[in-house]
Amino acid sequence: MTAGLLGAVAPGFDRPLDVLEACHGRITKQCDTLNKLLTHLPINGADAQAQQAARAVLAYFDTAAVHHHDDEERNLFPLLEWVGASGACDLVETLTLEHDELALLWRRLRMELQQIEKGEASTLDETLTGRFISLNRSHLEFENTHVLPLARQVLGTAEIERLGRAMAARRNVPFVY
């Protein structure tokens, strides 16, 4: 575990499933920010707060969320298939398709957020933003209630370490076990 500057404790890559779950919490917080932007913008426009919020959402989904999907698609999902987890193939197919849809939605939403970040626009497409938030929330709920418990059940110590090492390497940080 690593302590943050503000005292928050984040799991280390020696506990990669906890890292993924913590990331789900951060994605949820970014979705909360998007939801707040939907109500903030019509009243306040692209003021400094809106620009800062857009910047934070952009930074998160352009970096950490990309790593997160790579962690799952390149490492976790193949490990679940490799150990022969029940239903893993169907699960992986469904979740990968959802990741693809989220990526498409993000590309469209990203353009709008960039305009808000620059103060050049003061609206978000409510349907697009709502779909992005809704799909993220249902996707994360499913992963938290089905995928992560399955992984905790079927992955052994060696697979967990392999996952953690890959996740740390993706971020260019040392793996400490």
Where are these predicted regions, by residue range?
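Small-residue-biased structural context
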Residues: M1-Y177
